[in-house]
Curated annotation (Swiss-Prot):
Taxonomic source organism: Dictyostelium discoideum
InterPro entries: Leu-rich_rpt (IPR001611), LRR-containing_regulator (IPR052201), LRR_dom_sf (IPR032675)
Taxonomic classification: Eukaryota, Amoebozoa, Evosea, Eumycetozoa, Dictyostelia
Positions annotated as LRR repeat: 376-397, 406-425, 435-456, 464-484, 492-513, 514-535, 543-564, 572-593, 601-622, 633-653
Residue ranges with Basic and acidic residues bias: 1-12
UniProt feature, compositional bias: Polar residues: 55-81
Keyword Membrane: no
Keywords: Leucine-rich repeat, Repeat
Descriptive protein name: Leucine-rich repeat-containing protein AAC1
UniProt cross-references to Pfam families, sorted A to Z: LRR_6 (PF13516)
SUPFAM superfamilies according to UniProt: RNI-like
Domain of life from the UniProt record: Eukaryota
Disordered: annotated span: 1-20, 51-103, 125-148, 307-333
Something else known: Several proteins derive from AAC-rich mRNA, which, due to a frameshift also have ACA and CAA codons and thus are Asn-, Thr- or Gln-rich.
Length: 797
C-alpha cells in the first residue's frame, strides 16, 4: 500500500501531460479471483488482467481501484473509451491500441514481459513507466505487446468534452496485409505513405482485406487482437466489404494442433460471430473445425500437419455420440447403384440423418453455425477447407437449421463429392436459401450420381438460381442427359459453366431456353456428334449472348462448317471464343467468316493461338468491309498467338481510313532497346502530315499489359473512362470548327475497335505506323459541310 501510494503521489506531483503504462497480455491459466484477493500486496506492473472487448467504466473511488483489473463486459455495446480513477483528483481517460508482430522471440506461455522491460530499463537507466507520448502511428514492430496510453486532463476539460474518442487503428497483423495490398495495387508508392494516411485508408480506401496469419505464437495476445479487430469492424470501418482468411501454405498447416485450435480457429469464429457490417467472407486452406489427427481424420490426405514439441497439444475432444440408425426409404437413380433417400428426412451413406427443423439447441455453436446463421452475410466462399464425412453433415445441418433470406452467393470448392451434393440438394429443393442467385461447386469430384440431384435442383420452380458453376468435375454425357429435363423446366438460370468436364460424343445437347452465357471450355466438344448437337441447340436458342468453346480441338472442316451454320442463323450471340482450336484457312475459316458476314449480332470474337497466317488474315479482312461495318461494326478481334506478318496486317488495316483516331498499343519486352524504339516511333510520328481536313492522329502507348488494366478501371468525376476522355481531348484540340452543334463531343459517334496482334511474328511498330492510311472526310447532302465520324481503333502488339 505504501509503495503504490508513493507512486501515485509522484505521478500527481509531476503533472505530466500524458503517461504510458505497459502491461502484458494474460495467459489462459490466470485466475481473476486470486488476483483480486492478492491485489493489496501486488504492484501494478505484476498484475496481468484478462483482456475483454469492452471494459465498463469504473466509478469506484476506492484507493485500491488502480490495482484492480477492469470488470469484463462480454456483450457488444458502444465503443466508448474506458475511464478509471485513482487516489488523485485527476481523472484519466484511456484508449487501447494493439500491435502485433511479424517475428516474435521464442517465449513461453508464462513469460512476464514487464519484468523483462524493467530489467532492460535498469540497464539503460531509463524509467519503467513514465515516457513521453507522441502521435500514434502504425509501425511495423518486432515484438508482441499491448500498449495502453493514458492521457491526463483537468476536470474542467473532462466536463466540457461530451463525445468519446474513437479508435481508428487496426492491429498490426491486419495493418500489414492492408499495406501490402495497397502498395501492390499501386494506390501508394510505399508503406510510409500508407502509414501517413492511415485514417483515410481505413475509413475509405480499403474494401477487401486478406488475412494470412503469419508468425502467430502467443494465444492471449492474438485473442485480444481478434477482439479489437471485431470492435473496429463494427464501429469504424464501414467501407470494408470483404474479409478473407487465407492459408498461404495451401495444402499444409504450419501450426501445431494447439495453436490452430486455440488461436486461429477462435480468431475466425470471433470475426464471423460478432460481424455486423461485412457481407463477404472467404476461408481458403483452413479447416473450419477443430483438428486432432490422433482420434479422427479431419484433414484431407493432401494436408500436412506440423506438430510442435515446445507446446503441449490440446486433449482430444470426446467422441461424438453415434448417430441414430434410421431405416431409409429408397429412390433409385437411373445410373446409381446405391440407395438414395430424398424426403423430409435425408439419410447419408454413413447413416447420419439431416432433419429440417428450426430447433438450434442440438447444433454445436462453432464456426459452421456462425457462418451459416449470420444473416449479414451475402457471400460465403469456402475453398479447400478439408471436410470429411462428419464435417459435411455438421456444415449442411447448420445450413438447414433456419431459413436464410440474405445469402446470395455460395461457393464450395472442397471435394464434397456426391454425398455433399445430396445433402445440399435437400436444402435447395426446400428453398431454405430464399435469395440464392449464384452457386459455384467446382472441383468437387461430382459424378453422374450428383447429376441426378442437380436435375432435381434445376427442376425446382421456387429456386431462382441464375448462375451455376460445375467446372472441373467428372460429369460426362450421361450425366448431362440426366440434367436435360431440369434444364428444360428451369426458367431463371442465365449462366452455366461446364468447363473441364467430359461432354464426350453425344448429340443430345440442351441447356434450356433461358441461358445467356454458356462456358464449355475444355469439355471435349470437338467430336462430330457433340458439335452437331450443339449447333442444333444454337439454331433454336433465342437468349444466348456469350459462348466459350476454347480448348476443344474443333479444327476439323466439318465441325467448323456445322458450327458456322448455327452462327448464321442465331441472331442473339455477341461474343464467341474459339481460341486454341487449330483453325486456319484450310480448316473451316472460310465458312466461319461467311457466317459472320451474315450474322449482324456478333461483335467480338477470339481466335487466339490458332493457325492463322497471312493468307488467313486476308480472309478475315472481309469482316471490316463497308457492308459489315454498316450494320454492326466489330468491337474486338483477338488474333494473338498466331503467325500474321506485315502482309496480313496491311490487309487487315486497309479500311482504317474511316477512323480518325488510331491507338497502336504494343508490349516491348526488350528493356535494352526501349529508348531506341521510342526514338524511332517519335521520328515516324513527326513525318506524318497533320492537316486540318485530312489527318490521322496516332498515339503510341508502350507496355500495354501494364497500363491498360489501370486505365480501364479508373473513371473520372464525370463517369467517363479516362481513355475515352483522353481521346475526346485530342479530337477537340485538333478541330477548328466553332459550331456548338458539332458532333465531335457526341459520345455516340465515338466507337471502339480492338485488334489484338500480340505474340505474332515480329512486327515493327515503325512499319505499322507507315501502313496506316489517312483519314478521308465525307460530305453531307444537307449542308455540304465536312462531317467527321470520330472512332477509335486499337492495335495491340
Amino acid at each position: 500500500m505504501k509503495r503504490t501510494s508513493n507512486r501515485n503521489e509522484e505521478a500527481t506531483a509531476k503533472l505530466s501531460s500524458s503517461t504510458t503504462i505497459t502491461t502484458t497480455t494474460t495467459n489462459k491459466y490466470y485466475n481473476m479471483a486470486n488476483a483480486e484477493k492478492s491485489s493489496k500486496s501486488t504492484t501494478i506492473s505484476n498484475l496481468i488482467p484478462k483482456y475483454s472487448l469492452f471494459n465498463e467504466p469504473n466509478n469506484d473511488n476506492d484507493t485500491n481501484s488502480s490495482t484492480r483489473p477492469n470488470k469484463q463486459q462480454k456483450l457488444l455495446k458502444s465503443n466508448e473509451s474506458t475511464t478509471s480513477t485513482t487516489t488523485t483528483t485527476t481523472p484519466i481517460t484511456t484508449t487501447t491500441t494493439t500491435t502485433t508482430t511479424t517475428t516474435t522471440p521464442n517465449l513461453s506461455k508464462y513469460y512476464n514481459y514487464n519484468l523483462y522491460i524493467e530489467k532492460q530499463n535498469e540497464k539503460q537507466n531509463l524509467p519503467t513507466t513514465e515516457t513521453e507520448t507522441t502521435t500514434i502511428t502504425p509501425t511495423l514492430t518486432t515484438t508482441t505487446t499491448t500498449t495502453t496510453t493514458t492521457t491526463t486532463t483537468t476536470t474542467k476539460q473532462i466536463q466540457n468534452t461530451t463525445t468519446s474518442t474513437i479508435n481508428h487503428f487496426l492491429p498490426l497483423i491486419i495493418q500489414k496485409e492492408i499495406i501490402f495490398l495497397l502498395v501492390e495495387l499501386g494506390s501508394f508508392l510505399n508503406a510510409r505513405k500508407v502509414c501517413k494516411y492511415w485514417k483515410k485508408v481505413c475509413n475509405g480506401c480499403v474494401e477487401n482485406l486478406n488475412i494470412y496469419f503469419t508468425d502467430i505464437h502467443l494465444s492471449a495476445s492474438v485473442k485480444h487482437v481478434s477482439e479489437v479487430f471485431v470492435k473496429s469492424l463494427n464501429s469504424d470501418y464501414f467501407h470494408l466489404q470483404s474479409v478473407s482468411f487465407i492459408n498461404g501454405a495451401k495444402n499444409s498447416i504450419s501450426y501445431s494442433e494447439f495453436y490452430f485450435n486455440n488461436v486461429i480457429l477462435p480468431f475466425i469464429e470471433n470475426v464471423v460471430r460478432y460481424n455486423q457490417t461485412i457481407e463477404n467472407f472467404t476461408i481458403k486452406g483452413f479447416p473450419i473445425t477443430r483438428i486432432n489427427n490422433k482420434s479422427s481424420q479431419q484433414l484431407l490426405p493432401s494436408y500436412k500437419l506440423y506438430h510442435s514439441t515446445s507446446v503441449p497439444s490440446s486433449p482430444p475432444p470426446p467422441p461424438p455420440p453415434p448417430p441414430p440408425q434410421i431405416q431409409q426409404p429408397t429412390i433409385t437413380a437411373p445410373t446409381s447403384t446405391t440407395a438414395i433417400a430424398v424426403s423430409s428426412t435425408t439419410t447419408t451413406a454413413t447413416g447420419q440423418t439431416l432433419n429440417n427443423n428450426n430447433n438450434n439447441n442440438n447444433i454445436p455453436k462453432g464456426l459452421n453455425y456462425y457462418l451459416t446463421n449470420n444473416f449479414k452475410l451475402k457471400k460465403i466462399n469456402l475453398k479447400n477447407i478439408g471436410l470429411d464425412s462428419r464435417d459435411k453433415f455438421d456444415f449442411f445441418s447448420s445450413l438447414s437449421s433456419s431459413v436464410n433470406n440474405t445469402l446470395e452467393t455460395l461457393i464450395i470448392c472442397d471435394n464434397i463429392g456426391d454425398e455433399g451434393m445430396q445433402l445440399l440438394s435437400v436444402i435447395l429443393i426446400k428453398n431454405l436459401l430464399k435469395v440464392l442467385k449464384r452457386l459455384e461447386l467446382q472441383k468437387n469430384q461430382f459424378t453422374n450420381q450428383s447429376a441426378y440431384y442437380l436435375n432435381k435442383v434445376l427442376s425446382c420452380e421456387q429456386l431462382q438460381l441464375e448462375t451455376l458453376n460445375l467446372s472441373s468435375n467428372r460429369i460426362d454425357e450421361q450425366g448431362l442427359i440426366m440434367m436435360k429435363d431440369g434444364f428444360g423446366r428451369n426458367k431463371s438460370l442465365k449462366e452455366f459453366i461446364f468447363s473441364k468436364n467430359r461432354l464426350g460424343n453425344t448429340d443430345s445437347v440442351d441447356f434450356g431456353k433461358s441461358i445467356t452465357s454458356l462456358d464449355l471450355h475444355d469439355s471435349m466438344v470437338g467430336s462430330k456428334q457433340s458439335i452437331k448437337g450443339l449447333s442444333q441447340y444454337l439454331k433454336f436458342n433465342e437468349s444466348i449472348t456469350s459462348l466459350n468453346l476454347s480448348f476443344n480441338h474443333i479444327g476439323s472442316n466439318e465441325a467448323i462448317k456445322s458450327l458456322s451454320k448455327s452462327f448464321a442463323v442465331n441472331q442473339t450471340l455477341k461474343f464467341v471464343d474459339l481460341s486454341f482450336n487449330k483453325i486456319n484457312s484450310n480448316f473451316g475459316l472460310d465458312h466461319l467468316v461467311s457466317s459472320l458476314l451474315i450474322n449482324h449480332s456478333i461483335h467480338s470474337i477470339s481466335l487466339q493461338s490458332n493457325q492463322i497466317d497471312n493468307t488467313s488474315a486476308i480472309t478475315l479482312s472481309q469482316l471490316f468491309n463497308s457492308s459489315r461495318q454498316l450494320f454492326s461494326p466489330f468491337k474486338y478481334l483477338n488474333l494473338s498467338g498466331n503467325k500474321i506478318g506485315i502482309g496480313g496486317l496491311k490487309k487487315l488495316i486497309n479500311d482504317l481510313s474511316k477512323y480518325s483516331k488510331t491507338h497502336i498499343i504494343y508490349n516491348n519486352n526488350d528493356d535494352n532497346n526501349n529508348n531506341k524504339n521510342e526514338n524511332e516511333n517519335k521520328s515516324k510520328i513527326k513525318n506524318l502530315s497533320f492537316n486540318n481536313n485530312n489527318n490521322n492522329f496516332v498515339k503510341i502507348i508502350k507496355n500495354y499489359h501494364d497500363t491498360i488494366p489501370i486505365i480501364r478501371t479508373i473513371n473520372n468525376s464525370n463517369g467517363k473512362n479516362l481513355l475515352e476522355e483522353e481521346v475526346e481531348q485530342v479530337i477537340n484540340s485538333s478541330s477548328n470548327d466553332t459550331n456548338q452543334n458539332d458532333n465531335i463531343n457526341n459520345e455516340n459517334n465515338l466507337t471502339e475497335i480492338s485488334i489484338d496482334l500480340s505474340s505474332n511474328s515480329p512486327l515493327e511498330v515503325s512499319k505499322v505506323i507507315g501502313l496506316i492510311p489517312r483519314y478521308k472526310s465525307k460530305l453531307t447532302f444537307a449542308d455540304r459541310k465536312p462531317v467527321k465520324k470520330y472512332k477509335l481503333v486499337k492495335l495491340l502488339f
